[in-house]
Each structure stands twice: as structure tokens, then as C-alpha cells.
Amino acid sequence: SCIDFGGDCDGEKDDCQCCRSNGYCSCYNLFGYLKSGCKCEVGTSAEFRRICRRKAKQCYNSDPDKCVSVYKPKRR
């Protein structure tokens, strides 16, 4: 299921977990390598496209009712 904005996420997994509405996992870096205080935050379109593109598609496919994705099926 998706994590609400402000909810805890695991910074050791990756930067883009299933945060609601295309959010991303934002952490503080301590000493350059320890991640702490990781929370789901709203990302700008640039951040979202850079780190969350593939993950958002996976989240949307696994739980479309709870995740909003920019990837809607295109009609040809």
C-alpha cells in the first residue's frame, strides 16, 4: 500500500517507494552516508521524473486505487 505524505519510508531501500500521489522518499544525510528522518514528500516534476519513473509505474500497477501515477494508458 502507499505511504501518506509525512509518513515514514525506508531510505535504505531506494529513493522512490510507493509514496501516495507520486511522492518520493526524502531523507537527511548524516555524515554523507547515514540516512535518517526519511519521510514521503511531494516531489517536483523534475525530481519525480529523475528518480521515480519506473517505481511509480510498479506502484500503480500493484495498487492502482491507492497510488496515483502519471502513467495512464495511452489510446492509439
Swiss-Prot record:
Q: To which protein family does this belong?
A: Belongs to the neurotoxin 04 (omega-agtx) family. 03 (type II/III omega-agtx) subfamily.
Q: What is its main location?
A: secreted
**Cited Pfam families:** Toxin_34 (PF08396)
Keyword Transcription recorded: no
Cysteine pairs bridged by disulfides in the record: 2-19, 9-25, 16-52, 18-40, 27-38, 59-67
InterPro entries, alphabetically?
Answer: Omega-agatoxin_II/III_CS (IPR005853), Toxin_34 (IPR013605)
The entry's protein name is Omega-agatoxin-Aa3b
What's in the misc comment field? Negative results: does not inhibit Cav3 (T-type) channels.
Query: What is this protein's tissue specificity according to the annotation?
Result: Expressed by the venom gland.
Q: Where in the cell is it found?
A: Secreted
The UniProt keyword set, sorted, is: Calcium channel impairing toxin, Disulfide bond, Ion channel impairing toxin, Knottin, Neurotoxin, Presynaptic neurotoxin, Secreted, Toxin, Voltage-gated calcium channel impairing toxin
Q: Which GO terms describe its molecular function?
A: calcium channel regulator activity; toxin activity
Q: Which organism is it from?
A: Agelenopsis aperta (North American funnel-web spider)
The protein's job, in short, is: Omega-agatoxins are antagonists of voltage-gated calcium channels. This toxin blocks calcium channels in insect central neurons but not at peripheral neuromuscular junctions. In vertebrates, it is broadly active against all high-threshold Cav1/CACNA1 channels and Cav2.2/CACNA1B channels.
State whether keyword Protease applies: no
Relay the domain remarks. The presence of a 'disulfide through disulfide knot' structurally defines this protein as a knottin.
Record-level GO cellular component terms: extracellular region; host cell presynaptic membrane
What does UniProt list as this organism's lineage? Eukaryota, Metazoa, Ecdysozoa, Arthropoda, Chelicerata
